A protein has these predicted regions:
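Interfacial non-cytosolic loop connecting adjacent transmembrane helices
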Residues: 34-66, 115-154
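Alpha-helical transmembrane segments and their immediate interhelical/interface regions
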Residues: 1-5, 55-93
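Cytosolic juxtamembrane helix at the C-terminal end of the final transmembrane segment
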Residues: 2-8, 85-97, 120-128, 162-195
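Hydrophobic alpha-helical membrane-insertion segments
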Residues: 15-32, 100-122
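Hydrophobic cores of alpha-helical transmembrane segments in multi-pass inner/ER membrane proteins
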Residues: 75-80, 157-171
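Hydrophobic alpha-helical transmembrane segments
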Residues: 96-100, 155-158
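Loop-to-transmembrane boundary segments
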Residues: 5-15, 147-157
Length: 196
């Protein structure tokens, strides 16, 4: 039973690190199509409403979010790395530090997911308000990218869904670990009583 449990926690810790790295890559790519399609629609960044495409200011509006999103994804990677530093992925018996680390990763993952989901959905709505007829005309004139795709907005459902599932399983694993340790201590106590 312990081997299965330890194997599961190794897989969970590694999976959380991989998902966090994918979210980091996502934070680097989320603005790519917006840049290619919308950057040159605004002639003067100091006057965002003077544009050849109505609504194209979403690219500029997302800049601060994207900076914070990148920083938050790095923090999430560091939190997941801390699982390996505290050896949470391989300990048969958890110490208080392992439980604290597990709680930090879980809280960070849930908070990050809720915050990012709200922001990305708001910017997706702003993107969908763009006048796509004007964008098509602009793209034809300037030979720039034309897209109505919301792929970069929608993929967050998969990534943050995996993160939330991962942290829920990490918490479940810690509870399971605690239960196994209590059962082991009860067996040891019974053995000591029988020997006495």
């Amino acid at each position: 039973m312990y081997k299965k449990q330890v194997k599961l926690q190794r897989i969970l810790c590694l999976a959380l690190l991989i998902v966090s790295a994918l979210i980091f890559l996502y934070s680097l790519g989320i603005m790519t199509d917006l840049y290619d399609a919308l950057y040159n629609t605004i002639r003067n960044p100091n006057k965002l409403d003077k544009t050849t495409v109505t609504g194209s200011r979403v690219y500029y509006d997302m800049q601060d979010f994207n900076k914070n999103f990148l920083k938050a994804s790095i923090v999430m990677i560091l939190l997941c790395v801390s699982l390996f530093i505290t050896q949470t992925q391989s300990r048969r018996k958890y110490y208080i530090g392992n439980y604290i680390d597990t709680a930090l990763v879980a809280a960070g993952g849930i908070a990050f997911s809720v915050w990012a989901h709200g922001e990305i959905e708001a910017f997706k709505a702003q993107f969908l308000a763009i006048n796509f007829e004007e964008l098509a005309e602009h793209a034809a004139k300037k030979k720039s990218l034309y897209t109505e795709s919301t792929f970069w907005f929608d993929i967050h459902y998969v990534l943050f869904g995996l993160l939330v599932i991962g942290v829920i399983l990490l918490i479940a694993n810690a509870v399971w670990k605690r239960k196994l340790m209590k059962e082991e201590q009860a067996l040891i106590a019974q053995g000591e009583e029988a020997a006495a």
